[in-house]
C-alpha cells in the first residue's frame, strides 16, 4: 500500500477546485468582457487599454461620434437606447449649382444613412456644437448608463492625450462610465484596419458580440476583395488618381479645389486599397490647390469627395467656375466620378467600403467589369443594416448615388 497517496475523495476535490480556478481565468484583450459579478457589473477593456465597469444591461447611452456607433445600434435593434448625440450630423442637406447655360441643378434630401434609418435622432440633445466643448450639464441630465466616445470623429476630432484624459475624468466624475473607441485619424497611421476592432468592442459593450463579429468580417471581406483584384497591377500601369474637393471655401480663398496628401486616409484608399497612385504627392488634408497646380498634376482619374458640400460630376464639367479645368485628361476622357455624400465623415463610418469600391472601379473599370456598383451597394446596405430592397434604394438616394444607375456604373 502507498502511504503517500491522497485519499480518493480528497484527490477528486482538489482536481475540481483546480479546474474551477483555471476556467475563471481571463486576459485583458481589447473588447473582452469579464463575467458579471454578484451585482451584475461587467467589465470591458476599451481601445485605450482602460478597464471600464458597465451595468449588466445598458438602457441609456450617449454617443460622442458621427453615426458610427448609432449605425451599429440600429443593426442590433437597440437604437431606442440612444439619448444624446455628439454632433449636429443628423441634418437633411440640399446642394445646388448653376451651369454655364444658366441651368440650375439641385440635390435634395442628402443625409447620413443612419439619419434616414433613425429619424428620431433629430430630436435628441446634441452635446457638442460647432466650436464648443462637451456640454456636461446636459450630459449629466440625460443620466446615461455609459458614454461611448470615438476619437477622431468630428464630435471629438481635435486635441491631445491630455485633453482626452481631462474629458474622460470629467465625465467619470459624474459617475458615468466612458468607453473609448480609437478611429482612423487618432491611430498611428490612418487606415481602416482597426474598424473591425471598434465594431467588436461596441458589440461587447451592448452584448451583441457574435453579430458584431459577423459584421466586422463582412466589411473586411469587401476590402479584401478589392485588394485581391488589384494586387498584381504593375507600378507603371497604376493610374494617377486624385481626390479633388470642389469646395466653395477653396474658391473663396482663391483656389480651385482641395487635395489630400500621402499622410491622409484619402490617400490610403487610393494607394493601399485600390492600389492606384495618388497624383497629389504633398502632405496634409483639405489642402487648397490652384487651377495651375491641378492642371500640372493632370490626374488620369478624379473622384469627387464631400467637401463643404456634395459635388456631382456635372459640376466639374459644366459649372462656370470650372471651365478652366476642361483640358484635364480626366475631364476629356470622362473619368470623373462622385463619391457618396458623407458629411462629418472624418473617422469613417460603416459605409467606408462604398467609397473604396467606387474608387477601385473608377481606377480599374476592367477589373471590376462584373460588379455593377449601383446593385452591389444595395446588397451592401441589406447586409450591414438588415433592410429590405426598397429601403436600400432609399439609402442609395440619401447618399446621392443614383448617378450610378443612370451611368451604368
Regions found by a protein language model. Name each.
Residues 1-36:
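Secretory targeting signatures
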Residues 26-409:
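N-terminal ligand-binding lobe of clamshell/alpha-beta domains
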Amino acid at each position: 500500500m502507498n502511504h503517500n497517496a491522497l485519499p480518493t475523495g480528497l484527490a477528486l476535490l482538489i482536481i475540481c477546485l483546480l479546474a474551477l480556478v483555471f476556467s475563471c481565468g481571463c486576459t485583458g484583450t481589447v473588447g473582452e468582457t469579464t463575467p458579471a459579478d454578484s451585482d451584475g457589473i461587467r467589465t470591458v477593456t476599451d481601445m485605450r487599454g482602460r478597464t471600464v465597469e458597465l451595468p449588466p444591461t445598458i438602457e441609456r447611452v450617449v454617443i460622442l461620434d458621427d453615426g458610427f456607433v448609432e449605425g451599429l445600434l440600429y443593426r442590433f435593434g437597440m437604437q431606442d437606447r440612444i439619448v444624446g448625440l455628439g454632433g449636429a450630423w443628423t441634418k437633411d442637406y440640399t446642394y445646388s449649382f448653376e451651369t454655364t447655360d444658366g441651368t440650375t441643378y439641385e440635390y435634395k434630401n442628402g443625409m447620413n444613412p443612419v439619419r434616414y434609418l433613425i429619424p428620431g435622432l433629430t430630436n435628441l440633445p446634441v452635446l457638442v456644437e460647432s466650436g464648443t466643448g462637451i456640454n456636461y450639464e446636459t450630459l449629466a441630465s440625460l443620466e446615461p448608463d455609459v458614454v461611448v466616445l470615438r476619437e477622431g470623429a468630428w464630435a471629438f476630432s481635435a486635441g491631445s492625450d491630455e485633453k482626452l484624459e481631462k474629458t474622460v475624468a470629467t465625465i467619470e466624475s459624474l459617475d458615468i462610465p466612458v468607453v473609448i473607441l480609437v478611429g482612423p485619424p487618432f491611430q498611428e497611421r490612418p487606415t481602416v484596419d482597426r474598424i473591425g476592432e471598434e465594431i467588436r468592442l461596441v458589440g461587447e459593450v451592448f452584448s451583441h458580440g457574435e453579430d458584431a463579429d459577423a459584421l466586422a468580417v463582412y466589411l473586411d471581406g469587401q476590402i479584401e476583395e478589392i485588394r485581391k483584384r488589384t494586387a498584381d497591377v504593375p507600378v507603371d500601369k497604376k493610374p494617377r488618381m486624385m481626390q479633388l474637393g470642389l469646395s466653395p471655401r477653396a474658391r473663396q480663398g482663391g483656389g480651385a479645389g482641395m487635395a489630400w496628401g500621402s499622410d491622409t486616409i484619402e490617400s490610403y484608399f487610393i494607394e493601399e486599397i485600390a492600389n492606384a497612385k495618388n497624383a497629389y504627392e504633398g502632405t496634409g488634408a483639405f489642402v487648397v490647390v490652384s487651377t495651375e497646380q491641378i492642371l500640372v498634376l493632370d490626374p488620369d482619374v478624379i473622384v469627387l469627395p464631400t467637401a463643404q458640400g456634395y459635388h456631382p460630376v456635372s459640376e466639374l464639367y459644366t459649372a462656370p467656375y470650372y471651365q478652366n479645368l476642361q483640358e484635364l485628361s480626366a475631364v476629356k476622357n470622362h473619368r470623373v466620378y462622385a463619391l457618396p455624400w458623407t458629411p462629418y465623415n472624418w473617422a469613417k463610418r460603416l459605409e467606408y467600403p462604398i467609397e473604396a469600391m467606387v474608387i477601385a472601379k473608377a481606377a480599374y473599370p476592367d477589373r471590376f467589369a462584373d460588379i455593377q456598383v449601383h446593385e452591389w451597394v444595395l446588397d451592401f446596405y441589406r447586409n450591414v443594416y438588415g433592410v429590405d430592397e426598397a429601403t436600400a434604394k432609399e439609402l442609395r438616394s440619401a447618399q446621392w448615388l443614383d448617378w450610378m444607375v443612370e451611368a451604368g456604373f
